[in-house]
């Protein structure tokens, strides 16, 4: 099953429809690809948009499984239902299939893609657990660990966490995946090969850039930059590297020029990232505003707008939202944001801390676990230097860090602040 990318091609066409000038050419091209697979755009829920540009091909009928071979019939039925957005039916068909027909890794990849298309992102955590167990127990030391299919599965797992807005867990997933599959960095940074593209490499890299910036606390950016084993990845993500350095140097205006410039532009062009951009952008602005609220007793909205290079009205709305949402004892008089005088200093500190906790619980989790993350990465370096004969001992140490076997990873409870 290597034709799932055509499904996302339909969704990309629908997403970018208003910005497309040569609609007829693109629709005809996509219709031709689908026809070669015995599929038709007429079965898509977006057909009302495409109808004026569809050719004169015969209407497509759903394939009868009794008249076609079992392997081809299964693939056709899965694709047919997914194209029609009957994702639960497509997933059910694939789940009931014989894994041996396509191989376990490819089966996982197909399932993960269907879950992403159907926005059932949480299901991919279980698939990632099963894949990791399979690779560790059944494919240890084999060339399977180096295949692009495995790398794609690990990236699909990362994307699923990102699209759930689980940014810290997504970063954790990437760090662990790089440790388990060092070839993943090469896969991510390598140019597209033009075959079977589901999520673009540029989209993966943008997701990772955003996840790191949002999840890691301001005071820990410098530590992240100094993690030597992540240098190849950081060097391959120049936008992330530049943004981290700007934030470390508190050049917030320059950072937001990039954040609201090329990063926002790329995100809004992606059918995967655009739906979460508003939330991501709000997280990032609030994160910087909380920084100023924590260190300042009195600050003006105009100063914040000027320093962050964000429109005055946007900053005023953000500050007002913070005050209203978290019921903190801070007042606004005209342009001035200040702590109310009747608030004891101890309570003031507590209230400011509450802002940071509640704006994004994952930020707090990251603060609590930053030392564990650093220790985790240091352990990777130690494990990689141990002889292969000691690998079983290394794996035990690695799993001790995770505090569980693979089947417990789904419930790491990171959102509840438990230790890694």
From Swiss-Prot:
Region Disordered, annotated ranges: 386-420
PROSITE patterns, A to Z: PCI
Domain of life: Eukaryota
Disulphide-bridged cysteine pairs: none
Predominant location category: cytoplasm
Quaternary assembly: Component of a COP9 signalosome-like (CSN) complex.
Protein name in UniProt: COP9 signalosome complex subunit 11
Organismal lineage: Eukaryota, Fungi, Dikarya, Ascomycota, Saccharomycotina
Gene: PCI8
């Amino acid at each position: 099953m290597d034709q799932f990318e055509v499904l996302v091609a339909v969704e990309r066409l629908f997403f970018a429809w208003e910005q497309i000038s040569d609609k007829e050419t693109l629709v005809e091209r996509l219709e031709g690809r689908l026809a070669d697979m015995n599929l038709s755009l007429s079965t898509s829920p977006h057909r009302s948009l495409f109808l004026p540009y569809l050719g004169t091909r015969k209407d497509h009928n759903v394939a009868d499984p009794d008249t076609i071979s079992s392997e081809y019939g299964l693939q056709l039925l899965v694709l047919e239902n997914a194209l029609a957005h009957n994702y639960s039916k497509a997933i059910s068909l694939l789940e009931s299939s014989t894994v041996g027909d396509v191989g376990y890794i490819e089966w996982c990849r197909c399932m993960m893609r269907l879950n992403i298309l159907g926005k059932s992102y949480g299901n991919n955590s279980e698939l990632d657990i099963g894949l990791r167990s399979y690779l560790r127990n059944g494919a240890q030391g084999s060339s399977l660990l180096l295949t692009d299919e495995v790398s794609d599965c690990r990236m699909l797992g990362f994307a699923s966490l990102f699209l759930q807005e689980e940014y810290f867990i997504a970063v954790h997933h990437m760090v662990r995946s790089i440790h388990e599959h060092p070839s993943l960095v090469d896969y991510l940074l390598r140019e597209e090969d033009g075959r079977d593209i589901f999520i673009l490499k540029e989209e993966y890299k943008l997701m990772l850039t955003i996840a790191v910036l949002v999840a890691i606390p301001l005071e820990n950016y410098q530590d992240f930059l100094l993690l030597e084993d992540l240098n190849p990845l950081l060097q391959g993500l120049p936008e992330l590297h530049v943004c981290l350095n700007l934030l470390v140097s508190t050049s917030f205006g320059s950072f937001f020029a990039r954040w609201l410039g090329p990063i926002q532009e790329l995100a809004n062009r992606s059918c995967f990232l655009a739906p979460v951009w508003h939330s991501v952008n709000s997280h990032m602005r609030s994160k910087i505003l909380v920084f100023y609220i924590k260190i300042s007793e009195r600050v003006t909205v105009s100063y914040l707008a000027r320093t962050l290079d964000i429109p005055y009205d946007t900053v005023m709305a953000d500050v007002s939202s913070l005050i209203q949402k978290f019921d903190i004892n801070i007042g606004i008089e005209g342009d001035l944001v200040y702590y109310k005088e009747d608030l004891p200093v101890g309570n003031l500190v507590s209230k400011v801390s509450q802002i940071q906790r509640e704006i994004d619980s994952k930020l707090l989790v990251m603060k609590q676990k930053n030392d564990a993350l650093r220790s985790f990465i240091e352990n990777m370096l130690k494990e990689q230097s141990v002889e292969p004969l000691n690998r079983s001992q290394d794996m035990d140490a690695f799993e001790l860090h995770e505090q569980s076997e693979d089947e417990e990873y789904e419930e790491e409870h990171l959102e509840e602040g438990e230790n890694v």
